[in-house]
């Protein structure tokens, strides 16, 4: 039998080397374009999990003792290697996820490299405080947590792995990372790159598997902290398991974000933001602004330009750099999205975008724009995670803020207006962890990212991420003797 196109050396990466255990359940990595099996792996058994834990515990202490600047240099070298191999990594990500190569070349490994570089630079600046109390004084030490667990999602596999690994390793922790079983491949490449950059064996380990593997890891007494990117349902389950052992968690979960367009907005910029916030990665982005609120005075011009640009989006082979929209990650996920579309029509929403001819295969879905959407419709309340935009009308500022906040989610929001006083006023009033003004879905490594309400706990990226991967120790020094 021929070796699958993207077959890794083995399923797991532990203690600086690839490890296989074929007794674990089979995991098939499938190219969603045509259903081709591109890799066959095996989920972790309890034996594999214990090997990863033992390796990480052993390596973490020595890694933490290294000078922070030395840890930073390893991360910086890894960033350089990732950039040098950006095309190779992007091709792998496109085959595993179905996302267009035009996206993966600029937004996946590249973003991961930026994060490694950012935290590589921060590592040498980690410090505590000194406080005087008369002649006595207190100083604080910022210490690593120990062995951290990262659990990834299938939409940005290598980016998420790097976003979790970079701050953890910069602070002197070890990390065990479990990729999504749907897209298991690129995290293994990150582990190889970190090792090549000089990361000691065991500091970053990869174990494969489904939710049962994540649950076993999250409840393991050796795990000091859990960071997960995924659905609200999965996040609640993992957070509950972690908190049973009094472990801190960082959760980046789902969203139903509002993108608000005022009458005075630049139409072209607002349409660009809405397209980016609904159809990039075929809509499979947690922070997408899928509730597009249009003030009535701009509605007609906005929709006319939007529909013209949506009609021009190229759907096709994701390896073609001219392609704008590829398949969804799987046929099963495509069917889930189609169910939401059908339900929206039953509930009275009107589909504006004309039907498109789709390539052969079971994972494709055309971009959809719904108008006549009301706040009570399922489409306006639940996360679809596909190329489906809901357009809602509004009259005034107070009305739209109240409606934008009327959701269990709080990941992100966008505001398009020329009135920056109004924009800053709304940014303060909107219940969201991230607000973009006259832009959307831009996430530089130096910007903290995360949600409130049911969209998550804690933040990824930015200097604040250091707080989530360290613990403070206070040392009181008496000068009375």
UniProtKB/Swiss-Prot annotation:
K(+) 1 binds at residues 29, 96, 182. Pathway: Amine and polyamine biosynthesis; betaine biosynthesis via choline pathway; betaine from betaine aldehyde: step 1/1. Its cofactor is K(+). It comes from the Bacteria. The active site is at 164 (charge relay system), 252 (proton acceptor), 286 (nucleophile), 460 (charge relay system). It catalyses: betaine aldehyde + NAD(+) + H2O = glycine betaine + NADH + 2 H(+). Binds 2 potassium ions per subunit. The modification Cysteine sulfenic acid (-SOH) is found at residue 286. Its EC number is 1.2.1.8. NAD(+) binds at residues 152-154, 178-181, 231-234, 254, 286, 383. Keywords: Metal-binding, NAD, NADP, Oxidation, Oxidoreductase, Plasmid, Potassium. K(+) 2 binds at residues 246, 453, 456. Disulfide bonds: none annotated. GO terms for molecular function: betaine-aldehyde dehydrogenase (NAD+) activity; metal ion binding. One of its GO terms (biological process) is glycine betaine biosynthetic process from choline. Dimer of dimers. Involved in the biosynthesis of the osmoprotectant glycine betaine. Catalyzes the irreversible oxidation of betaine aldehyde to the corresponding acid. This is Betaine aldehyde dehydrogenase 2.
């Amino acid at each position: 039998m021929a070796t699958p196109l993207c077959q890794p050396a083995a399923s797991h990466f532990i203690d600086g080397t690839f490890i296989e255990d074929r007794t674990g359940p089979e995991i098939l990595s499938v190219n969603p374009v045509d259903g081709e099996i591109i890799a066959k792996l095996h989920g972790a058994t309890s034996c594999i999990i214990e090997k990863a834990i033992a390796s990480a515990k052993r390596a973490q202490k020595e890694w933490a003792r290294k000078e922070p600047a030395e840890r930073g240099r390893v991360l910086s070298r890894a960033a350089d290697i990732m950039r040098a191999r950006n095309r190779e990594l992007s091709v792998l990500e496109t085959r595993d996820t179905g996302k267009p190569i035009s996206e993966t070349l600029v937004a996946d490994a590249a973003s991961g490299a930026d994060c490694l570089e950012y935290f590589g630079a921060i590592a040498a600046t980690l410090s505590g405080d000194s406080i005087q109390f008369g002649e006595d004084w207190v100083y604080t030490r910022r210490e690593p947590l120990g062995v951290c667990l990262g659990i990834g999602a299938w939409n940005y596999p290598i980016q998420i792995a790097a976003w979790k690994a970079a701050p953890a390793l910069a602070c002197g922790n070890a990390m065990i990372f479990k990729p999504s079983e749907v897209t298991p491949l690129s995290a293994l490449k990150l582990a190889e790159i970190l090792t090549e950059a000089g990361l000691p064996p065991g500091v970053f380990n990869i174990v494969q598997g489904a939710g049962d593997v994540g649950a076993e890891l999250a409840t393991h007494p050796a795990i000091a902290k859990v960071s997960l990117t995924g659905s609200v349902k999965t996040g609640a389950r993992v957070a509950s398991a972690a908190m049973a052992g009094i472990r801190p968690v960082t959760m980046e979960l789902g969203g139903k974000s509002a993108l608000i367009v005022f009458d005075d907005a630049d139409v072209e910029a607002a349409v660009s933001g809405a397209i980016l916030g609904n159809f990039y990665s075929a809509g499979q982005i947690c922070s997408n602004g899928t509730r597009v609120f249009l003030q009535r005075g701009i509605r007609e011009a906005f929709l006319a330009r939007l529909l013209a640009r949506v009609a021009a989006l190229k759907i096709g082979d994701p390896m073609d750099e001219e392609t704008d929209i590829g398949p969804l990650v799987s046929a099963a996920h495509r069917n889930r999205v189609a169910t939401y579309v059908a339900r929206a029509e039953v509930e009275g929403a009107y589909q504006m975008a004309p039907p498109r001819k789709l390539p052969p295969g079971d994972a494709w879905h055309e971009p959809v724009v719904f108008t006549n959407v009301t706040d009570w419709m399922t489409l306006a309340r639940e996360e679809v995670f596909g190329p489906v935009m809901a357009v809602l009308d509004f009259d005034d500022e107070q009305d739209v803020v109240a409606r934008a906040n009327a959701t269990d989610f709080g990941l992100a929001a966008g505001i398009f207006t020329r009135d920056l006083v109004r924009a800053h006023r709304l940014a303060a009033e909107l219940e969201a962890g991230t607000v973009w003004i006259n832009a959307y879905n831009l996430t530089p490594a130096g910007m903290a990212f995360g949600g409130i309400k049911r969209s998550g706990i804690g933040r990824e990226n930015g200097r604040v991420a250091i707080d989530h991967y360290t613990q403070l120790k206070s040392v009181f020094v008496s000068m009375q003797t």
